[in-house]
Each structure stands twice: as structure tokens, then as C-alpha cells.
Amino acid sequence: MQKQIFFSFVLVMMLLGKVKAQHNNPFGNALIPDMIADASIQEINGVFYCYATTDGYGQGLKTSGPPVVWKSKDFVHWSFDGTYFPSAAKEKYWAPSKAIFANGKYYIYPTINGYMYPAVADKPEGPFKLARGKDEFYKPFTPSTLLQSKNPGGIDAEIFVDDDGQAYVFWGRRHVAKLNEDMITVDSVVQVISTPRKEYSEGPIFFKRKGIYLSLIHISEPTRRR
């Protein structure tokens, strides 16, 4: 009887300790132990890759962490090794999208200092560099940027490749256009996806499941976000 009481006491204390540990952790039981947003996760050759915005905790948009890609073989244990885009490590680096394999290379489309850029590498973990021009991120709408003219909401690129091989790029405020075969230029025809909600939106995710196209967007209102 005493052994049973002692075991019950130990079990209760272990559970209380676990609850306390979770309470002290501001991120809860996070899948990835980092302050990230705009995550895109994909499996490449048996390895899961998570590309995301790395925010400085409590800093908002004033700063961002270096671009790192978290990797895992079991979707439980995650790690990273250095930065995958060294020349952009000190820039404001957001929403890199998932890596797309095409033309024998891997492509990502991060928003750097407020503008979308196509970047290329031989491996999904990089190192990446701009697909066109020098790795310079301070001039808007140069030959290096994904868009060659000003476009409202031109941030947060998301790439979707349809069953026929056609690639599309989605970005802020519900914009979408075809991505050309070179994967670094955009078709001149740009459309806006019609939705019942008309507020400002960003951070699109687009995918196809069981024959149905699904679009997820982040909607912002003056007093709240969704």
C-alpha cells in the first residue's frame, strides 16, 4: 500500500512538473524550437525541410533572424546547420516559400527588404544566391527582383506546380500569375483571386488535395488579424 501511494505521489509530481515546464515555455510544445512564421514544409528525398521567416522575439518587423532551414527525418527531431542564404543573413528576410526543383536546380522566392526575389542553389539546404544579378537587396524592381514593376502587396511569394507542370506564383493581396519555364520570370498577365472577404491579405498558401484546389490566406483588419 505504501509503495502504491509513493508511486502515485511520484506520478503526480512528474505531471505537475511537465505542466509547469509547458507553462514557463512561451512557445508551448512547439514542433520546431524557434520563433518562426510563414513556414513552408516539404519532403525531399526522405528529409523534411522547413523554410520560414525567423523573427527576433518581441521585435516585430524591426528585425529578422538569419535564413535557416530546419531539417528532420522523422518530423519530430529538427535541426539546422548554418544559414542557407549567406548574403541575405543580415537583411530583413521573410516568407521564403518552399524549394522548387526545376531545370536541375532548387529555387526559392524570399521577400528581402520588402521585395520578392528568385534565388537558386544546387541543393535544398543551399547555399542560395540570386538567380539574376549580384546579391544586392537595396534597389527596388531591378532585374534581380521577381516582379519588374510595382505591384501592390508584392510580398510573400508562394509557388504551386499543377499536375501539368505549369508553375504559378501567388503573393500578397490575392495576386497570382504564371511562372515562366525559367522559374525566375513572371507572365505579364496578373490576376486577383476573388474572395468574399476584401481586406488586405498576405502569406498565401496554395495546394491541391483530392482534385480540389485550396487557398489559405492571412487577412488583416485594423484591430485584429486572422
What are these regions (language model features)?
Residues D55-Q59, Y115, V176, S220:
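Short glycine/acidic-enriched loop and turn motifs that connect beta-strands
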Residues V68, F75, S79-N103, T111-N113:
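Blade-loop segments of beta-propeller domains
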Residues A52-F80:
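Beta-propeller domains
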Residues Y115-D163:
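Asp-box/WD-like beta-propeller blade repeats and closely related beta-sheet repeat scaffolds
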Residues E43-G46, F101-G104, V161-D164, K208-G211:
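Residue-level detector of Asp-centered blade-edge/turn motifs that repeat once per structural unit
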Residues A37-A39, W94-S97, I155-E158, E202-I205:
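Beta-propeller and closely related beta-sheet repeat lectin domains
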Residues I217-R226:
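Residue-level detector of conserved catalytic or cofactor/ligand-binding positions
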